[in-house]
Amino acid sequence: MSLTMEWNDARLRKEAALIPPRAALGASMIYHGLGKLREGAPEQVGGYFESVGLKPGKSLAVATGIAEVFAGVGAIIGLWTRPAALAVLATQAFALGKVTAKNGYDITKGGFEYNIALMCIAGALLIAGPGLFSAHEGIERLAEGRGPRKFLRKAQPSPLLRLIKLIK
């Protein structure tokens, strides 16, 4: 597909429609991940994790923070979007099950409304993938030899290309 297609093209609009959910999910996950990694937070979050039965709390807090930051960056730039979506689904399902489910749906009462919204966005990205306007698409184009010819010679299908397509 040429990037010079007209905006009237329905497929182009559908591809562009993946950008806002990727950006929203990514920004949210980066924010929450960095919150778990800032000074003193691993101990605080780790203490909470241990209070709900997750041990070792501090290590899990750091691992969760790192996973959320990487998932957020991946979602925003459209690289490893499906693994990022899986990470979001896992962390949010866990948060829902261990923390928010007992409070009901209403977010103002500590409920799971926000978890469900993030999980729905992640589920959609898991199904759709990163879309045309993504780092993954750019890398794939380069690996297939569809990118700037002066930088790459035409690539033959390779194990690397198959891996790139697999982790889309």
Question: PLM features: what roles do these ranges have?
Answer:
Residues 72:
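Conformational-control "hinges and anchors"
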Residues 1-35, 58, 62-66, 77-168:
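Extended, low-polarity transmembrane helix blocks
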Residues 40-56:
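Membrane-interface interhelical connector segments
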